[in-house]
């Protein structure tokens, strides 16, 4: 059996996910967080993405894709607001709730899947 080594950071060097929030759903760990862009003049300018790994293999992470585009929020149709520090919860109804803060506005947003 080939051994893999875990590194810190565990995501690829091109991926910047500060404020990471890990959650176990089923047999996978999902990491949600703000999404920075290399060389950008501000933080949290990208849409939200998610990475996951099997709870049995935290060395092999998979890109789950974009989970929420900042322009999807009705208060941010132009995409001018930055979204900070997201977190996810699974509701009793089985749906997933993505909570996020708008930059410097004192408001929270929620998206439901």
Report residues per predicted region:
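Carbohydrate-active catalytic/glycan-binding domains of CAZyme proteins
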Residues: 1-113
């Amino acid at each position: 059996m080939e051994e893999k080594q875990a590194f810190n950071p565990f995501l690829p060097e091109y991926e910047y996910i500060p404020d990471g929030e890990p959650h176990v759903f089923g047999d996978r760990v999902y990491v949600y967080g703000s999404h920075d862009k290399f060389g950008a003049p501000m933080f949290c300018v990208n849409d939200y993405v998610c990475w996951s790994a099997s709870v049995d293999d935290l060395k092999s992470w998979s890109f789950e894709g974009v989970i929420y585009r900042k322009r999807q929020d009705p208060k941010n149709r132009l995409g001018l607001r930055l979204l900070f520090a997201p977190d996810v919860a699974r509701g009793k109804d089985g749906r997933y709730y993505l909570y996020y803060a708008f930059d410097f506005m004192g408001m929270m947003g929620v998206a439901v899947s």
